[in-house]
Each structure stands twice: as structure tokens, then as C-alpha cells.
Amino acid sequence: MERERLIKTVEAILRGAGYRVARLDLKGSCFDLVASRLFLLLFIKATVNIDTITEEQAEDLKRLAKFFKASPLIVGLRSKSGELEEGVVYERFGIYALRPETLYDALLNNELPAVFAERGGLYVRINGELLRELREKHGYSVNELAQLLGVSRKSLLNYERGEQAVSLDVAIQLEEIFDEALAEPIDILRAKVEADLNVKPETPLEREVFERLKKLGLGLVKVKKAPFNAISTEDDIRLLTGIDERKTRSTIKRAEMVAEVGRIVNSGGVFILEKTKAEVVSEVPLIPKESLEEVKDADELIELIDKLKKEIKEKLFS
């Protein structure tokens, strides 16, 4: 119940900030919400305890963010160490994690957080060049200011070079001494992450489908914890691709979610099944694996998908 309330809160924040939002209802998914506004795209995992995010989920989240040039975020309320603090950025497997209030301030008040948590306490990164200018302007030597702050000369020089984060206490002292903001905001909405996009298929059916799609000239990015199994891509073609043995209630539910996500990330969707009759679920075609043998390249696959969608639409309105 607490998690459900959290997801609804995050969704309300996003919509209140003018984002288009798709929400997933898939246990264990690497993201719960995907949202877009102008040139910003966010993949968000909402979880009460941020330490429950697995490395596998995090890697998938980073893969999606890298592929779609989006920012991944984890929104939560606590960690194993205790409650998350408002206005503080935490990290889980290289992904920013924060409270919903912090997200609210960033999206609706244009107030980006500056404080981040690391082992040992709370820190900020400061504008080192401005610090040096202010120190010289106010007539402090390196030794004098270091002594006043209770830090070493080496640490102060590192602050000025931008080579070392500053503890929150020291940052507050600096801003009180110079009466000027020195902390640099953390742009949580434009986070850059590294991710391995070369992940192998897991099942014999996935391997078979991957091989066939590659023969058609499509590149593939495998995703483990999402409603789709892969993203198929070729030039400006992007297909959220599901793979299943047969059509089940789970397949239909996943296809519906793929349709929702596709609308936000401007991508088509397709499900390739071991055995099925061709049909469309929420504008996402379900096609039998053997259909891949009938097309020569990616363009023909898109034509097949579009033709199927058109036929289904005509049947509905005939």
C-alpha cells in the first residue's frame, strides 16, 4: 500500500509539471514510470526502500536511459540506514535516488538539489574558481581560510581546483563567511550513465528471434526487467519487442504496457510468439515467429506490422 501511494504521488508530481506519463503494473520491473516533456525523458523506479533495488534492475534502468538518452531516477522514502532526507541526493548502483519532495522541488519549483550523501556524511560540490576569487577578494590566505574552516591547506586547495567535495558543514561556513552561494546544483534531470548495451539473450526462443532480427538488419538491446524483452533498432526505427512462447493473459498485459510506454518514448511495439495467430493488442501486433521468415529486411518487417494494424482497424470499423 505504501509503495502504491508513492507511485501515485510521483505520477501526480510529473503530471503537475506538464509531463506525459505512462505507468507500469509489472512486478520486478526496472522502472515504474516513464515520463516526457519537451526534450526531457525520465525512467523512474519508485520503491519505498531504495536498497531493495537489485543490481539487475539498475543495469536495465541504465541501459534504457542510455539507449533513449534519458535520465534514470529512483524515488524512495528510506534506505536500510534510515529515512531519506529531503533535498539530498543518494545513489544506488550509479543512479540518483531521492525523496518525492526533492523531485517536486526540482520539477515544479526549479530548485535542483545540491547536497549528496556519501559514506561518512553529506557533501556538496562547490564552484572552486569562485571560492578562490572570494578568498582573494576578502584578503584571506590559503592557510588563514583553512584554519578558519578547520580543514587542511591541501583540502582547501582541492576545493578551489574542484577536485574534492566539501562537507555540508564546511559549505555552510563558506557561504556564511562570504555571503554568497557556492554550492553547485546536481542536475538530476540530465544525469548521464554508463551501461553495457551488449547483453545476450537468455532463452532458446530469444536467441532464435534475436538471430532472425539481426539477419533483417536490426540491432538489438536486451532488457531483462521490463514489459518488453528487447529494443530492436535500425536507423530511425525503434521497436519495443516482446518475445513469448504463446499468448497468455500476461502477454496481453505486457503488450498493453508496451503500447503505453511506446507513446511516451516515440517507439513502436511488436510481440513475437512461438505460435499464435496474427492479431493486435492495443496497437501492438502479436505475430508468429514464422512471420519473420517471410520478410527480407527491417523495412519489410515494419510494412508487415503496419499492414496488420491497418487490417485489424478496418475489421473493427467495417
Swiss-Prot record:
Binding region for DNA: 142-161
The record ties this protein, via PROSITE patterns, to:
HTH_CROC1
Domain HTH cro/C1-type spans what residues? Answer: 131-189
Q: Does the keyword Transcription regulation apply?
A: yes
Arranged from A to Z, the UniProt key words for this protein are: DNA-binding, Transcription, Transcription regulation
Q: Which residues form a coiled coil?
A: none
GO MF terms here are: DNA binding; DNA-binding transcription factor activity
Asked if Acetylation is a keyword of the record, the answer is no
Q: Which HAMAP family match?
A: HTH_type_cro_C1
Name used for this protein in its record:
Putative HTH-type transcriptional regulatory protein TK0539
Species of origin reads Thermococcus kodakarensis (strain ATCC BAA-918 / JCM 12380 / KOD1)
